Amino acid sequence: MSWQTYVDDHLMCEIEGNRLTSAAIIGQDGSVWAQSATFPQFKPEEITAIMNDFAEPGTLAPTGLYLGGTKYMVIQGEAGAVIRGKKGPGGITVKKTNQALIIGIYDEPMTPGQCNMIVERLGDYLIEQSL
């Protein structure tokens, strides 16, 4: 299965009638493995900042999480495993696997819980596959 298939079928899937607005699988080095057509163009330093927060949880909280120039307020996540952010009626979930970052971006009517479930389910599966 290609990485694009994971994005198309497992991240951009429908859940209770809702979908993520965009999603991607990004290597921990910032390389794009696969992404939805609407995923924002991000800067390498934004991925570096996310990786730094996984290494030292809490580093993004004072400044916020930036992706594609959009600032998300960092909310409760799982130290070293999941970073969650909020911006208005939407937000972002970033799940770290052994080699990649699974990123989902959502807006209403999708809920934070639905986004978390989609992103973390794929992340957990890839971790089980040692990816």
Swiss-Prot record:
<dbReference type="InterPro" id="IPR027310">
    <property type="entry name" value="Profilin_CS"/>
</dbReference>
<keyword id="KW-0009">Actin-binding</keyword>
<dbReference type="GO" id="GO:0005856">
    <property type="term" value="C:cytoskeleton"/>
</dbReference>
<dbReference type="InterPro" id="IPR048278">
    <property type="entry name" value="PFN"/>
</dbReference>
<protein>
    <recommendedName>
        <fullName>Profilin</fullName>
    </recommendedName>
</protein>
<comment type="function">
    <text>Binds to actin and affects the structure of the cytoskeleton. At high concentrations, profilin prevents the polymerization of actin, whereas it enhances it at low concentrations. By binding to PIP2, it inhibits the formation of IP3 and DG.</text>
</comment>
<dbReference type="InterPro" id="IPR005455">
    <property type="entry name" value="PFN_euk"/>
</dbReference>
<keyword id="KW-0020">Allergen</keyword>
<comment type="similarity">
    <text>Belongs to the profilin family.</text>
</comment>
<keyword id="KW-0206">Cytoskeleton</keyword>
<keyword id="KW-0963">Cytoplasm</keyword>
<dbReference type="Pfam" id="PF00235">
    <property type="entry name" value="Profilin"/>
</dbReference>
<dbReference type="GO" id="GO:0003779">
    <property type="term" value="F:actin binding"/>
</dbReference>
<comment type="subunit">
    <text>Occurs in many kinds of cells as a complex with monomeric actin in a 1:1 ratio.</text>
</comment>
<dbReference type="GO" id="GO:0005737">
    <property type="term" value="C:cytoplasm"/>
</dbReference>
<dbReference type="InterPro" id="IPR036140">
    <property type="entry name" value="PFN_sf"/>
</dbReference>
